[in-house]
Design a protein with these regions (language model features):
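Alpha-helix boundary/capping motif
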Residues: 5-7
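Amphipathic alpha-helical interface elements
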Residues: 36-44, 104, 113-118
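Long beta-strand-rich cores associated with HINT superfamily self-processing modules
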Residues: 101, 108, 113-199
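An acidic, glycine-/histidine-flanked metal-binding catalytic module
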Residues: 17-63, 167-199
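Short, flexible, solvent-exposed loop/turn segments with mixed acidic/basic and small polar residues
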Residues: 94-104
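Surface-exposed, low-hydrophobicity interaction/linker segments
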Residues: 44, 48-94
Length: 199
């Protein structure tokens, strides 16, 4: 049974990696180009997301082999838009430039939805121990939720990449949460960040 389970998980991961490659291949066409946050600005973050996603796939296999099968419900990623970057830079009083954006750790983000709180923390332990990146910090909004009720475990990792023959480390934020937490986060985002349309 475990042999068949491993084969099933492996096939699922192959399809997810293929999907990631297809999305990544067209991402630059969907990324708005501005003076400071153009295609060249996003390139290192795209490379870091691809590397991080593969590391998540490996961690997923380890988690599902040692504990509950299909503990990982979904894995998604996104790159913060230029408008969102500018808004955050303004809130933090940072320069509206690539240099200012270097202080942000969530331009590249990945989200993993897991079946339970226990699976969230176990998955976090696996990620911290992975040689694919360097663990920077964690913000545990599960143990201490935000005032809005938002709950999630955020991990910041430095992902090594090689571009144009030069190596660099790019920060990536990984959000871990359960389906219920994910649903609440979506509701909160719609209420807090979407503009209200006048009738």
């Amino acid at each position: 049974p475990w042999r068949m389970l491993r084969i099933t998980i492996f096939i699922r991961l192959i399809f997810e990696v293929i999907a990631l490659q297809r999305i990544s291949s067209v991402q630059p066409m969907r990324t708005p180009k501005t003076a400071d946050f153009g295609f060249s600005f996003y390139a290192p973050y795209e490379a870091a997301v691809e590397t991080a996603f593969l590391a998540l796939c490996a961690a997923r296999m380890q988690l599902e082999e040692e504990s509950t099968p299909f503990a990982v419900r979904s894995m998604t990623f996104r790159l913060k838009s230029p408008a969102s970057i500018r808004d955050k830079l303004t809130r933090r009083g940072l320069p509206q430039s690539a240099e200012g954006a270097a202080y942000l750790h969530d331009i590249a983000g990945l989200r993993v939805v897991l079946s339970s709180v226990e699976a969230v923390y176990r998955f976090a332990d696996i990620l911290r121990a992975s040689p694919s990146w360097q663990f920077v910090c964690a913000r545990d909004y599960i143990a201490v939720p935000k005032k809005s009720g938002y709950r999630s475990l955020h991990l910041v990792m430095l992902v090594p990449i090689c571009r144009n023959g030069k190596s660099a480390s790019v920060p990536v934020e990984i959000q871990l949460r359960t389906p219920a937490m994910d649903m609440w986060a979506c509701v909160e985002h719609d209420l807090c960040y979407k503009p209200v349309k006048e009738a």
